[in-house]
Each structure stands twice: as structure tokens, then as C-alpha cells.
């Protein structure tokens, strides 16, 4: 009789573990992006269509913008702070991200690419 409760306990623990793994699979991927001196690093990121992702934005100098019309992103990146933007890309393609907050003489060249596959 003791075997049946032990089996039931092991089965319920196993179901809990597999359920926990499924929940972790749905957690957004995190991509770190740094804005500094007229550039974003990295210059290009690749995302998967239909998979949630958090873009973790940080500035190492002044206030910057992070604007991507196709992905409906318009964020401000303040120095010393982290700005998280979570999206789920719905269309494949390449989007250019620009800094839309004037940050100095090289501001017009501050761009990066997001590629959704």
C-alpha cells in the first residue's frame, strides 16, 4: 500500500517539474543593448517571429531614444537607468532602429538593425 502513494507523489512531482519547464520556455529572451556616443551595441540583433523578447536598453552617457516604427517601439533611454521593452515580433523582416532624441553631433548616424526571422 505504501508503494501507491509514493508513485502518486513521484508522478505529481514530475508533472510539476514539466509544467515549470513549460512556463520557463515562455519567458521572454533578454537582449542587452547599450547606447553610447552615437552608436548602439550590438549593431544588429536577430529575433524569432512569434517569440517574446525583452530589449534591455541602457545608456552609458546621455539620454538617447530608441525608435523602431515597424515594431511599434518608442522608448527613452536615460543614463544610469535600465529601460526594458518587451515585444513579440509578428512579421519577419529587417527594421532600422534610430535614436530619436538629439544626443549630439553624430546623432544622425546612430542606428542599428533588428532582424526578425
Listing of model-derived features with the role each one plays in the protein:
Residues 1-6:
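Positively charged n-region of N-terminal signal peptides that target proteins for export
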Residues 45-81:
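N-terminal, post-signal-peptide region of Sec/Tat-exported proteins
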Amino acid at each position: 500500500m505504501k508503494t501507491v502513494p509514493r508513485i502518486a507523489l513521484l508522478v505529481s512531482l514530475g508533472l510539476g517539474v514539466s509544467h515549470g519547464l513549460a512556463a520557463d520556455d515562455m519567458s521572454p529572451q533578454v537582449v542587452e543593448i547599450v547606447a553610447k556616443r552615437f552608436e548602439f551595441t550590438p549593431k544588429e540583433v536577430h529575433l524569432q517571429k512569434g517569440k517574446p523578447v525583452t530589449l534591455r536598453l541602457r545608456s552609458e552617457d546621455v539620454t538617447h531614444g530608441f525608435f523602431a516604427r515597424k515594431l511599434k517601439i518608442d522608448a527613452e533611454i536615460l543614463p544610469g537607468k535600465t529601460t526594458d521593452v518587451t515585444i513579440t515580433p509578428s512579421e519577419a523582416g529587417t527594421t532600422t532602429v534610430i535614436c530619436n532624441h538629439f544626443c549630439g553631433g553624430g546623432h544622425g548616424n546612430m542606428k542599428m538593425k533588428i532582424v526578425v526571422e
